[in-house]
Regions:
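Active-site-proximal substrate-binding groove within the catalytic cores of carbohydrate-active enzymes
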Residues: 1-128, 142-144
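C-terminal beta-strand-rich structural cap/linker in extracellular carbohydrate-active enzymes
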Residues: 132-156
Length: 156
């Protein structure tokens, strides 16, 4: 029924962007069903933006996934792609289901990235900060996620 569709797309841009962001951010190459991918110039630009994002980070997004926190609708959840052979060793996607912006200090397990001593973390691929790995190959990372939103981090 009507509640199960986001057509016309241009009237549901926020929801459509959330779907594109979740799918491409998780490295999902889906077969999209429906009459079209976009219905206006604005929706076409949105699709183009997220396809370009996926293409830019394809190598790491097509890599193995580690679940950081199980989604429960009560707090943040997230996944991390890891690839020790890639320049970008990890790609963290974090989601906030809450109506308020949140900041959390999380433990990020970096064992499967191949990193052993230090990691450089870039929020949305900007302004890298160096972290020393703990003995268990983890770092403590402060994350920020907007209300009902998403954020991502690159680890090199």
């Amino acid at each position: 029924g009507a509640a199960a569709t986001i057509e016309p797309l241009n009237e549901h841009l926020s929801h459509y962007e959330t779907r594109l962001r979740n799918l491409f951010g998780a490295g999902v190459q889906a077969c999209y069903r429906g009459p079209r991918l976009y219905d206006t110039e604005q929706t076409r630009k949105l699709v183009t933006q997220w396809v370009a994002f996926y293409k830019q980070y394809r190598q790491i997004l097509d890599s193995d996934i580690i679940h950081l926190r199980r989604p429960d609708g009560q707090d943040w959840d997230g996944i991390m792609h890891v690839n020790p052979q890639s320049k970008r060793k990890a790609f963290i996607s974090v989601y906030n289901p809450l109506d308020i912006a949140i900041e959390r200090e999380i433990e990020v397990p970096l064992y499967y990235t191949g990193l052993t001593n230090k990691a450089i973390v870039k929020e949305q691929d900007k302004n890298g900060k160096e972290y020393s790995l703990a003995r268990d190959y983890s770092i403590s990372l402060k994350i920020r996620i907007p209300a009902k939103g998403y954020n991502w981090y690159i680890i090199e």
